[in-house]
Amino acid sequence: TENTVPYGFDFSTPISRFEEAVRLIRLLWESEGPVDFEGRFFRLHHARMDTEPCNGRCPPIWIGASGPRMLEITGRYADGWWPAGAWTPEDYAAKLALVRDSAERAGRDPMAIVPAFILISLIGDDDELDAILQAPLVKAILLQVPAAELRKFGHEHPMGEGWRGYQDIDPGVLTRERILEFLARVEPRAILDLVPHGSPQQVARIVKAYCDAGLRVPKILDYGGMAGLKYAAISAQKVREAEDELMKLTGDI
């Protein structure tokens, strides 16, 4: 909400507004001549889209979706899917199935939607991970996770049972005292239960399970770099090692 509510934008129906916006974008791209549109949120009267697509192709639409309605919208309109929350390979597979089912119902090719994912990971040996997990920015991983999701892994959320994840992150509201209280309550085990961790080879094996679940564009993000320059300096090399191992494991996938 930090990009909407402080500036007076209505955030009460974000999914409905988003869907109408995507429909309108597609309409403008696919129409010739003036466009009239009477929607719940947007209205166009004799609007023109005179910029021609580059080489005859419109830009691909990528949607970051995790909830049921957004997954449905992804299947109807998106060219690529980049979820903001899929914490196990099984969860990823189930959500991808919803996207593809929606695409089929819309008469689209479900296999044409590219499944991607950034996998937040912690790459290092046990001693490194012990130190990394004490860093405030690493603990902040849990701010991205809804309380309901964390509860599935057997943990209560440090921000309380009503925490919704990304949409509740508003620096203007979260006081220094609230963040310090959050950091003091973070359990390292809660983070480790959520994200791939261990050696580059161990992380690669976990990411491989996501590829087996349908992931086709994996991106390994080593969050250990957030623990300070000591770890940031070697983070890229660790990711490269994990990606090289992943290439060996996935073969022709």
What do the predicted segments below correspond to?
Residues 11-49, 90-209, 251:
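An alpha-helical appendage that flanks or caps ligand/catalytic pockets
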Residues 27, 79-80:
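Well-ordered beta-strand positions
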Residues 78-79, 215:
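A structural motif
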Residues 166-180, 227-253:
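Short acidic, glycine/proline-enriched helix-loop-strand junctions
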Residues 5, 85-89, 167, 219-234:
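Glycine-rich, proline-tolerant flexible connector loops at the mouths of alpha/beta enzymes
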Residues 61-64, 81-83, 113-120, 218-221:
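Hydrophobic faces of well-ordered beta-strands that scaffold small-molecule active sites
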Residues 1-9, 76-78:
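Acidic/polar active-site rim loop that often engages polyanionic ligands
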